[in-house]
Amino acid sequence: MTKYGEMLIIDAKLVETFLKGRESFLIDLVERVYRAHHAGNTVCPDSYFLRFPDTPRDRIIALPSYINDQTCVSGIKWISSFPENVDHGLQRASAVIVLNNTDNGYAYAFIEASRISAARTAASAALAVRVLHGAPTSIGVVGSGPIAQKTLHFIKSLYTTAVPVKIHDLNGELVARIVTRHGPECSVVSLEEALGCDLVLLATSAGTPYVPMSVRFQPNQLVLNISLRDLHPETIRTANNVFDDVEHCLKANTTPHLLEQLNGNRNFITGTLAEFICSEKQLDPDHPTVFSPFGLGILDLAVAQSLYEHVQISGDGLRVPDFHGDMKR
């Protein structure tokens, strides 16, 4: 822990240095947090959305969280999504995390978090592949932004055998970049061909369904529904529908939320990823599987706390000794 009243500021460069090469560690960390959440050892309230009437696609989201398992950590992630940033050469998302002392509530760390957010999203998706599917024979990727690239990287870290990667994106420049980065097994394909792979990754900024309503996935397929709003409700109606957290995901007009509204019930829910990790549920092999992770703030906090502990040992970061001023009363 930082000295009493001190604030540790950790910038993007330190975050990147910490995350590099730690794919296996992060996947296992995410599994541990999912287990803690399933056991009731977390507090993960609803996300809070700040929206702008004149620019409805833009939003800033607050994700407060608390974990009480091997380590005790509380805090909040504040993450923005401004899709039009990409038209100006900027990343769509930016984020920070504040960690708070669970004894007195005082904040002790302020951390650049867009990279943490991408890494924990990718680690969660890779864990779902490991638990729900196993090694893919082909990977279809819809979207080629940072989340798609990071998730593909984490999935590939699980397995030594290279498989075809088929990528579809409306942005030709971005998709060319990801194809170049991931080597000769990557190719640019149509949406239909990408959706035909046995492992499908949806990572776009779509706000409403655009995949044709007629699309139906096959029993051998796992769909990582990262962006949550690409598919029509009918497409997932008969699938094995797996979530990180049911209550979190069934809101904000995600595809599962739309299906709940159409059905008037939640009978389409198969379970949470933690239930499969703990061998409490089984997939129906006669149906495809769709994993829809809303994204839990507890994952961000776990990664941020591990990073904080690493930086404390290394002595890096910017320390503000009297950040809170006179704390006595």
Where are the regions a protein language model picked out?
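Short acidic low-complexity segments
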Residues: 184-197, 214
